[in-house]
UniProtKB/Swiss-Prot annotation:
Mutation effect (D765H): In WD; uncertain significance
Protein name: Copper-transporting ATPase 2
Tissues expressing the protein: Most abundant in liver and kidney and also found in brain. Isoform 2 is expressed in brain but not in liver. The cleaved form WND/140 kDa is found in liver cell lines and other tissues.
Effect of substituting G1281D: In WD; uncertain significance
Consequence of substituting T1434M: In WD; uncertain significance; localized at the TGN as the wild-type under conditions of low-copper levels
Reported impact of L1083F: In WD; decreased copper transport activity; no effect on ATPase activity; decreased localization to the TGN
Outcome reported for the amino acid change (mutating S921R): In WD; uncertain significance
Organism of origin: Homo sapiens
Length: 1465
């Protein structure tokens, strides 16, 4: 007896160990409960005696390719050993395999292979070594359900659904198909049910419906009680209640009512199936029959569990949301004709019994954006006490509420809606005298046969949440209690968004989350503005939710938000009382944070929250209190770019100086003309008073006016510079003119005071001449500068000045149109854009179809198709067709504004070479002042030592002038000339003007360069590293070739494509998705045939039966461009003339899969497959009805321009490297196609940074070219990061250069433009340096011995000419033309040669050994041929952007040869 007890104890211990692997509650295995527990439902026989650990543990072998070292072995063992159900795992590097001991009921080998594949290796089940199930026959351990999932827009949605569902307990595996909008889930039915899976997908913001499933397990009450703790979705109370309800219905007799509904909006049998499957699952629904022809549904239901109104709502809530249900007369009230034969169940008494009159109120609601808002309002308000019924219309923006006025008032209803984050106002009320019986929130009355009123609880569509009567108590509180905490707003920084689909994904999913009231995501800024209920959710939870969607999110703690500012002009104010009236009214308005009104200027500055209120609303408030308000006129944003103010200023200064300078120049010329008649000059030399001649008096008057008028701006600028303890060119000019003026004035005053016989020689002629030439130079300089920013000004000029804001009524009919200035357009406005007009804001198309010209923004030459749901960019031109768009980003948040901001910042930034010039210019002015002083002193000394030197070069010395006066005058002349000729401006303008022109020209060519540093760095690049997936290739698999192997008369190409497309439509594999997409495009249809008996074998292929393809062939929209020899006289294929329904047995897969199914593969077919596989493509075979009939080659296709771009870079002396996480074979195949002979393969993303650093440590300047998402660390590490994508990729912070168009030749163009720009900068600097190095010595008189002498006005003219010449030199960059494709092809003609595999060196992972292409061993050939190369689709995953950019479909057929699509062997 003790021995038996020990055996029983040992078996129980083993059972608990296995159960821990299953994650089942241990208490379920207590001996006291063993008699009542249904072991057969979890896959074991009843009783513990037959259960042993060995009987439930299996051992299998998995083949693994791609391991290179013991680190790979350890990483695989560590990761797989941690999986549930894995007992042990041993990996052998030498044998390339792993031995796995596992529990089959918990984990399967396919899961193990999938996990290994996610690590970057290739894994498959070894043939003949798969574990067998235990000898005892086990009940169904796994079941499969197929869900229809609506709302997925990109690969991010797929990853999000797969990631979340895979984490659920009881889910074995999940595959989501974006193209088919389906999810296939394998699950353990004793742990989770299909309804729970559907509810989880719904909770993520998608619309899910069960498409097909296996019969659920029949669990007894004890099973439910013991297993429900493992179901995270169903609380215990809910499960018990459901069980009790079912027991009541099953054993006490149900009260069935038959109801006939009219349903509009059904189009096909799919709609019928959708309604029947989903409504049939609702609590209380016994049966439902839907007729598509009669547009009716006959429902048998239990009125104690549901009601007609609840059924109506449930059907209308089904995706796609187009169903409209009409109830029969009286179905909503108490007097319904549908009667039951028994009294109502005592188990469902009415929650509330309030007799009396019910009222109806109409509430206007603003801020609703989608059906989710409608459901949120209906769900929340219907739970309030006293609310009988609520119907919300999204199109009309209203809610009709039937309520009990003795319990709740319309004002409380309005407040409750506003607490949810919407704007609400009561429009009208009406009182009804018809008593509605025992109505309460969510209940209605239906009479039975004896007239007894029976409570019919309104059950919302099943969403996995608690029924209404299980809602928390807080939902039933009064509106006063729910308004205790006001909604709050938070801002999140989001990284990883690449396209509008990502924005839509985040907004849609967040709006479905409880507590989130409104969401607005800005792609360009990478920010999200979210209004939320702090009692329900917190910002960190929102950030975590976004991270679960596949993006990086962080809460911006110190971000104040994008509060709006508006400046208004207000007329009609008379006193301070008016000011106070306006300010107090504005500050009391919700949404306005600050208001300041100035009576003197009649201006008002208002700060507001654009989420709550807009500029038009503010103007309306001011006008309502008796004043007139309008938007204050401001200078357009582009005015500072065209330098109009500066040009006007310097033009005025030049003209003033010229008016007074011309007489001065005339007198100078007159005095310099030699004359033999001395009396002609005696008139001007005659003294008016002693010491003051007529000539000096005229000079003094003219010079004084020039100093005050022409030189005023120079003096203001010099004063500002000196006040900040700095010196610039204006200081030098003011010094020169002031010294000449003051010196002349002093000696003239002294002469007058001393009553000299002759008036002294003065410098009054110098300032007018200086100001004339310097002002002329500044004027011409700013004229030239205005041209440097012409590209940016052109971008800014794209912004529309006005927008047509419309008000929509029913059926989107336009009720009113209003022309609104751009500054007054608010977020959420509906804007009408006519043909030829500009899109004023970023938005989404609501109605209409058109083509948008985005060439000036993105550089895309061809117009882009826009349809409802498409995003539009502000500044693009509507080519044809009027459209209505909803504004999503206005003002500075638009894409155009962000691009302008980026280009502005680039033009303001300094290149490294400019920083050196700036440091030199900082010391330049003090140096010139010192040189000028030294020149003055030196010439005074020389003059007194040897007067002959000075006298020889002094122009026209007057015999009446003393020797000292001549020396002093000549010394001052040379000193002032030094001040005038020195020009730091030419040094300061050399780089900025070239950078401004260069970045502007680049922007016009679709290349956004972020500043002067990358612009200068690009010409130094010696190595360019290309990412493969999404950069060199398109990033998604495509069909490259279709090869027919059978009889074309029996199986023509159209029929093969129809059959193959239908078969692969049920596959979730990326290759299957690619084949399905190709077949649909070639056949011109979106619908395919029926697929049954589908079977997928990982690593091998699929098998199924296909039928109903005749309709596709008969009704395809466009004929396939097949060769004429395969068409009959009627133009159709021979096999299509008889539309006899057929069922085809289909096999699609690799060689091994077809051999397993008894097919023989000829050597010709095998050779054809090998040819494609050697190119890195995947070749699959197709067999129909046991006959091998075709081969399909699939690959991630190389971009057309890739090889040309690589060759051009190499011809420029740049080393090109391919770096990818893909396997070596695929990487080598891609490299041979594009001509790259250096490859880094099987590199993890974190290792890409190390590879960049490795090349940088060797002294090379490295450029990294990637998609800007997965490669962002490497982009940041590289000397120049280049992100390739659409115009929205300017949000990528890691890249230095963003190519708006997805064109690799723009990489070449950016380097080419950089070389041109840097060469122009060097020319400018050389000109500026030579000018100063030569000009200053000449001005100082160093070259007097060879007869070169300069007057001060000559120096000023030369200085002005230097600045103008530098700017004009930079403007020559505007003539730059980006080399076109024809030029590149002409240069490469005859030089581009494809590489062989032996010419490509492949570097594996972080290994330091280069691996040349060896001769393939027999084993390599066999393994390469027999396996499907899929790592290109798993190791180096395509970016979300690449997938989104490819959604529009291919522009060309994917067949290699359009004229020879069908090939035969």
């Amino acid at each position: 007896m003790p021995e038996q007890e020990r055996q029983i104890t040992a078996r129980e211990g083993a059972s608990r160990k296995i159960l821990s692997k299953l994650s089942l509650p241990t208490r379920a295995w207590e001996p006291a409960m063993k008699k009542s527990f249904a072991f057969d439902n979890v896959g074991y026989e009843g009783g513990l005696d037959g259960l042993g650990p060995s009987s439930q543990v299996a051992t299998s072998t998995v083949r693994i390719l791609g391991m290179t070292c013991q680190s790979c072995v350890k990483s695989i063992e560590d990761r797989i050993s941690n999986l549930k159900g894995i007992i042990s795992m041993k990996v052998s590097l030498e044998q390339g395999s792993a031995t796995v001991k596992y529990v089959p009921s918990v984990v399967c080998l396919q899961q193990v292979c999938h996990q290994i594949g996610d690590m970057g290796f290739e894994a498959s089940i070894a043939e003949g070594k798969a574990a067998s199930w235990p000898s005892r026959s086990l009940p169904a351990q796994e079941a499969v359900v197929k869900l229809r999932v609506e709302g997925m827009t990109c690969q991010s949605c797929v990853s999000s659904i797969e990631g979340k569902v895979r984490k659920l307990q009881g889910v074995v595996r999940v595959k989501v198909s974006l193209s088919n909008q389906e999810a296939v889930i394998t699950y353990q039915p004793y742990l989770i049910q299909p309804e729970d899976l559907r509810d989880h997908v719904n909770d993520m913001g998608f619309e899910a419906a069960i498409k097909s499933k296996v019969a659920p397990l029949s669990l007894g009450p004890i099973d439910i009680e013991r297993l429900q703790s493992t179901n995270p979705k169903r609380p215990l109370s809910s499960a018990n209640q459901n069980f009790n309800n079912s027991e009541t219905l099953g054993h006490q007799g149900s009260h069935v009512v038959t109801l006939q509904l009219r349903i509009d909006g059904m189009h096909c049998k799919s709609c019928v199936l959708n309604i029947e499957e989903n409504i049939g699952q609702l609590l209380g629904v016994q049966s439902i029959q839907v007729s598509l022809e009669n547009k009716t549904a006959q429902v048998k239901y239990d009125p104690s569990c549901t009601s007609p109104v609840a059924l109506q709502r449930a059907i209308e809530a089904l995706p796609p949301g187009n169903f409209k249900v009409s109830l029969p007369d009286g179905a909503e009230g108490s007097g319904t004709d549908h009667r039951s034969s028994s009294s109502h169940s005592p188990g469902s008494p009415p929650r509330n019994q309030v007799q009396g009159t019910c009222s109806t109120t109409l509430i206007a609601i603003a801020g609703m954006t989608c059906a989710s808002c409608v459901h949120s309002i209906e769900g929340m308000i219907s739970q309030l006490e006293g609310v009988q019924q609520i119907s919300v219309s999204l199109a009309e923006g209203t809610a009709t509420v039937l309520y009990n006025p003795s319990v709740i008032s319309p004002e409380e209803l309005r407040a409750a809606i506003e607490d949810m984050g919407f704007e609400a106002s009561v429009v009208s009320e009406s009182c009804s005298t018809n008593p509605l019986g025992n109505h309460s929130a969510g209940n209605s009355m239906v009479q039975t046969t004896d007239g007894t009123p029976t409570s019919v609880q309104e059950v919302a569509p099943h969403t996995g949440r608690l029924p209404a009567n299980h809602a928390p108590d807080i939902l039933a509180k009064s509106p006063q209690s729910t308004r205790a905490v006001a909604p709050q707003k938070c801002f999140l920084q989001i990284k990883g968004m690449t396209c509008a689909s990502c924005v839509s994904n985040i907004e849609r999913n967040l709006q479905k989350e409880a507590g989130v009231l409104s969401v607005l995501v800005a792609l360009m800024a990478g920010k999200a503005e979210i209004k939320y209920d702090p009692e329900v959710i917190q910002p960190l939870e929102i950030a975590q939710f976004i991270q679960d969607l596949g993006f990086e999110a962080a809460v911006m703690e110190d971000y104040a938000g994008s509060d709006g500012n508006i400046e208004l002009t207000i007329t009609g104010m008379t006193c301070a009382s008016c000011v106070h009236n306006i300010e107090s009214k504005l500050t009391r308005t919700n949404g306005i944070t600050y208001a300041s009104v100035a009576l003197a200027t009649s201006k008002a500055l208002v700060k507001f929250d654009p989420e709550i209120i807009g500029p038009r609303d503010i103007i309306k408030i001011i006008e309502e209190i008796g004043f007139h308000a309008s938007l204050a006129q401001r200078n357009p944003n582009a005015h500072h770019l065209d330098h109009k103010m500066e040009i006007k200023q310097w033009k005025k200064s030049f003209l003033c100086s010229l008016v007074f300078g011309i007489p001065v120049m005339a007198l100078m010329i007159y005095m310099l003309i030699p004359s033999n008649e001395p009396h002609q000059s005696m008139v001007l030399d005659h003294n008016i008073i002693p010491g003051l001649s007529i000539l000096n008096l005229i000079f003094f008057i003219l010079c004084t006016f020039v100093q005050l008028l022409g030189g005023w701006y120079f003096y203001v600028q010099a004063y500002k510079s000196l006040r900040h303890r700095s010196a610039n060119m204006d200081v030098l000019i003011v010094l020169a003119t002031s010294i000449a003026y003051v010196y002349s004035l002093v000696i003239l005053v002294v002469a007058v005071a001393e009553k000299a016989e002759r008036s002294p020689v003065t410098f009054f002629d110098t300032p007018p001449m200086l100001f004339v030439f310097i002002a002329l130079g500044r004027w011409l300089e700013h004229l030239a500068k205005s041209k440097t920013s012409e590209a940016l000004a052109k971008l800014m000029s794209l912004q529309a000045t006005e927008a047509t804001v419309v008000t929509l009524g029913e059926d989107n009919l336009i009720i009113r149109e209003e022309q609104v200035p751009m500054e007054l357009v608010q977020r959420g406005d509906i804007v009408k854009v006519v043909p030829g007009g500009k899109f004023p804001v970023d938005g989404k198309v609501l109605e209409g179809n058109t083509m948008a010209d985005e060439s000036l923004i993105t550089g895309e030459a061809m117009p882009v198709t826009k349809k409802p749901g498409s995003t539009v960019i502000a500044g693009s031109i509507n080519a044809h067709g009027s459209v209505l768009i909803k504004a999503t980003h206005v003002g500075n948040d638009t894409t155009l504004a962000q691009i302008v901001k980026l280009v502005e910042e680039a033009q303001m930034s300094k290149a490294p070479i400019q920083q050196l010039a700036d440091r030199f210019s900082g010391y330049f002015v003090p140096f010139i002042i010192i040189m000028s002083t030294l020149t003055l002193v030196v010439w005074i000394v020389i003059g007194f030592i040897d007067f002959g030197v000075v006298q020889r070069y002094f122009p026209n010395p007057n015999k009446h002038i003393s020797q000292t006066e001549v020396i002093i005058r000549f010394a001052f002349q040379t000193s002032i000339t030094v001040l005038c000729i020195a020009c730091p401006c030419s040094l300061g303008l050399a780089t900025p003007t070239a950078v401004m022109v260069g970045t502007g020209v680049a922007a016009q060519n679709g290349i956004l360069i972020k500043g002067g540093k990358p612009l200068e760095m690009a010409h130094k690049i010696k190595t360019v590293m290309f990412d493969k997936t999404g950069t060199i290739t398109h990033g998604v698999p495509r069909v490259m070739r279709v090869l027919l192997l059978g009889d074309v008369a029996t199986l023509p190409l159209r029929k093969v494509l129809a059959v193959v497309g239908t078969a692969e439509a049920s596959s979730e594999h990326p290759l299957g998705v690619a084949v399905t997409k190709y077949c649909k495009e070639e056949l011109g249809t979106e619908t395919l045939g029926y697929c049954t008996d589908f079977q997928a074998v990982p690593g091998c292929g699929i098998g199924c039966k296909v039928s109903n393809v005749e309709g596709i062939l008969a009704h395809s929209e466009r004929p396939l461009s097949a060769p004429a020899s395969h068409l009959n006289e009627a133009g159709s294929l021979p096999a299509e003339k008889d539309a006899v329904p057929q069922t085809f047995s289909v096999l699609i897969g690799n060689r091994e899969w077809l051999r397993r199914n008894g097919l023989t593969i000829s050597s010709d077919v095998s050779d054809a497959m090998t040819d494609h596989e050697m190119k890195g493509q995947t070749a699959i075979l197709v067999a129909i009805d046991g006959v091998l009939c075709g081969m399909i080659a699939i690959a991630d296709a190389v971009k057309q321009e890739a090889a040309l771009a690589v060759h051009t870079l190499q011809s420029m002396g740049v080393d090109v490297v391919l770096i990818t996480g893909d396997n070596r074979k695929t990487a080598r195949a891609i490299a041979t196609q594009v001509g790259i002979n250096k490859v880094f393969a099987e590199v993890l993303p974190s290792h890409k940074v190390a590879k960049v650093q490795e090349l940088q440590n060797k002294g090379k300047k490295v450029a990294m070219v990637g998609d800007g998402v997965n490669d962002s660390p490497a982009l940041a590490q590289a000397d120049m990061g280049v992100a390739i994508g659409t115009g929205t990729d300017v949000a990528i912070e890691a890249a230095d250069v963003v190519l708006i168009r997805n064109d690799l030749l723009d990489v070449v163009a950016s380097i080419h433009l950089s070389k041109r720009t840097v060469r122009r900068i060097r020319i400018n600097l050389v000109l500026a340096l030579i000018y100063n190095l030569v000009g200053i010595p000449i001005a100082a008189g160093v070259f007097m011995p060879i007869g070169i002498v300069l007057q001060p006005w000559m120096g000023s003219a030369a200085m002005a000419a230097s600045s103008v010449s530098v700017v004009l030199s930079s403007l020559q960059l505007k003539c730059y033309k980006k080399p076109d494709l024809e030029r590149y092809e002409a240069q490469a003609h005859g030089h581009m040669k494809p590489l062989t595999a032996s010419q490509v060196s492949v570097h594996i992972g972080m290994d330091d050994r280069w691996r040349d292409s060896p001769r393939a061993t027999p084993w390599d050939q066999v393994s390469y041929v027999s396996q499907v190369s899929l790592s290109s689709l798993t190791s180096d995953k395509p970016s979300r952007h690449s997938a989104a950019a490819d959604d529009d479909g291919d522009k060309w057929s994917l067949l290699l040869n359009g004229r020879d699509e069908e090939q035969y062997i």
